[in-house]
Regions:
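N-terminal secretory signal peptides that target proteins for export/translocation
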Residues: 1-3
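Extracytoplasmic/periplasmic substrate-binding proteins
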Residues: 58-71, 179-186, 191-199, 228-278, ...
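A ligand-binding cleft/hinge motif common to bilobed small-molecule-binding domains
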Residues: 118-128, 306-319
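C-terminal motif of bacterial Sec signal peptides marking the signal peptidase cleavage site
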Residues: 19-23
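Conserved N-terminal structural module of periplasmic/extracytoplasmic solute-binding proteins
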Residues: 6-9, 24-205, 234-235, 244, ...
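Helix-loop-helix "hinge/cap" segment bordering the ligand-binding cleft or interdomain interface
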Residues: 138, 164-231, 247-305, 354-365, ...
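Conserved small-residue motifs centered on glycine
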Residues: 368-486, 491
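General small-molecule cofactor/ligand-binding pocket signal
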Residues: 83-89, 280-281, 326-328
């Protein structure tokens, strides 16, 4: 079994910087140990003297010098009975390090990477299987991964999501069967109470609220958001039946920023901006600027995440002890409507999942090691760490221990002992990482949408399709983003909207739409 002892620094010394795989040779044929049950079926495995090498996109926890020092990796070896040799990228240069590793031909047994994310794996996983960098896992799962196989058979959507259009399984996935809406509108609840207003539901409610915040609460920044989050969620624009980018509408892929509803949305937002209801710095809003404005006490509403709330709540208490935040539903046009847009996280976004390389000498051992994390015990370990240390079972619920709860950073402490990317993400994983009840309530409210009906699934374009998308999509999006700001602040009249749409098509929008549709239909036929 290949030990993968060369470090990334050595690879850097022998390889030129690689940005594509042109000219790179494929790996060897996949190999497995003789026999079909060399290590038993229970954990820890009977694997004394055996070792697996892993390249992990997940960096070493910042508290430790090496992977071998991290409690999770130590415990993983103990529980599975498999010794591990673990390496990964340094300095956050994971894509560059991955490309260098692939180009070198010196591959570890297991590669934890963004295998379904086209920007990081151009041409998709089938290309890497064909060129013998990783192996198809169909037979491997049947032979040596009964726990993952059970999960796939019980969840048809998971089964569909984690294989290629040609039917190849390619990873042991990080999968989240129950997803949460991590982003949504937040309002100053104490201001609403002072003014006798309810949590806003409609666009009209929002206009009334923001106007009164400005006029009666002296808000100099009634509404703020980061443009990327607004466009990705359909915040406000969803009330007009649109969101910025590509989405599914009655089985067809459409581009929201080219449609009539987008013009209606821009018309209303231009009015709000002129009335001083949207922050004047909206075009250049970044996370730091947004935080400073929110905690200044002069902001009335923002589009934010549960994590932001966890940061802002204690900071605001120092500015104004009476300040209260509350999550609000995504705005609709008419009271009683259900928002069609919002944040919907894919159960399998294609990120941080484990492939077995074609250089692996012992596929059985690699598969059985990875399959541990789909056992009931393995899932608890991957999500919550070590029972009695980081969590305790209380009436069947894995409750985080006092050691974790009382630490300076709950998330960082858990991450020393648990790496959920190896497994099925337990919804209780996120529940306990939120400190304040406002966070939990907001996420529940934000999830009351039909965003999942419109969200594109994880699509796997071919290499040719990837080239087409790269050629046209950036120009289309860049132009649409520039015009969004111009229309919003009144620098461009909406009388030019038809010409703007024509320009989008000149830049290749129809080609992109046709390509998306082809890929989407392949996905449906998996």
């Amino acid at each position: 079994m290949k030990k993968f002892k060369k470090t990334l620094m050595l690879i850097l010394a022998i390889c030129l910087i690689v940005t594509s795989f042109a000219g790179c040779g494929g790996g060897k044929d996949a190999k497995s140990a003789s026999g079909e049950n060399n290590y038993g079926d229970t954990y820890p495995l009977n694997a004394e003297g055996k070792e697996l090498s892993i390249w992990s996109i997940i960096s070493v926890h910042n508290k430790y010098k090496s992977y071998q020092d991290v409690p999770f990796w130590q415990e993983a070896q103990k529980r599975t009975g498999v010794k591990l040799d673990i390496e990964g990228p340094t300095g956050g240069q994971f894509a560059e390090s991955f490309n260098l590793m692939i180009a070198s031909g010196d591959l570890p047994d297991i590669i934890l990477y963004d295998w379904g994310y086209n920007a990081h794996v151009p041409g998709g996983p089938d290309k890497y299987i064909k060129e013998k960098y990783i192996i198809a896992l169909n037979d491997v799962i049947d032979k040596w991964a009964p726990n993952l196989k059970r999960e796939l058979s019980e969840d048809p959507e998971m089964d569909k999501a984690v294989k290629t259009d040609s039917g190849n399984y390619y990873v042991f996935p990080r999968y989240e069967p129950v997803t949460s809406a991590w982003l949504g509108p937040v309002v100053r609840k104490d201001w609403l109470d002072d003014l006798g207003l309810a949590i806003p539901e409609t666009i009209e409610d929002w206009h009334t609220m923001l106007t009164r915040f400005k006029n009666e609460k002296g808000s100099t920044s009634p509404l703020i958001y980061q443009a990327g989050n607004m466009k990705g969620s359909g915040f406000l624009s969803g009330a007009f039946g649109e969101m910025f980018g590509f989405y599914i509408n009655d089985g067809k892929i459409v581009y929201g920023a080219s449609r009539p509803g987008w013009k209606d949305f821009l018309t209303e937002m231009q009015k709000w901006y002129a009335e001083g209801l949207i922050d004047r710095d909206i075009a250049a809003m970044d996370s730091t600027t947004m935080k400073n404005k929110v905690v200044s006490g002069k902001n009335g509403a923002f589009l934010g995440s549960g994590g932001m709330l966890g940061t802002y709540i204690p900071m605001m208490k120092e500015v104004d002890p009476k300040a209260k935040f509350a999550g609000a539903p995504y705005p609709v046009m008419n009271k009683g409507d259900r928002s069609q847009f919002g944040i919907h996280t894919l159960s399998y976004p294609g990120e941080m999942s484990s492939a077995i390389s074609a250089e692996c000498d012992d596929v059985e051992l690699a598969a059985k090691f990875l399959d541990y994390f789909y056992t009931e015990e393995g899932q608890l370990f991957a999500n919550f760490g070590i029972e009695g240390v980081t969590y305790n079972m209380v009436d069947g619920y894995p409750k985080l221990s006092d050691m974790v709860i009382n630490s300076d950073d709950i998330n960082s402490t858990i991450d020393e002992y648990a790496i959920s990317e190896f497994s099925i993400i337990d919804p209780r994983y996120y529940e306990q990482r939120m400190v304040f009840p406002e966070q939990k309530e907001a996420i529940k409210i934000w999830g009351e949408t039909d965003a999942g009906k419109h969200k594109l699934p994880l699509l796997l374009p071919t290499e040719e399709e990837s080239d087409i998308m790269a050629k046209y999509t950036t120009e289309v999006n860049t132009f649409a983003e520039e015009m969004y700001i111009k229309y919003l602040i009144g620098a461009e009249s909406l009388e030019s909207f038809d010409s703007y749409v024509d320009k989008l098509y000149e830049l290749g929008l129809q080609t992109v739409l046709d390509t998306y549709q082809t890929i989407y239909e392949r996905y449906l036929n998996r």
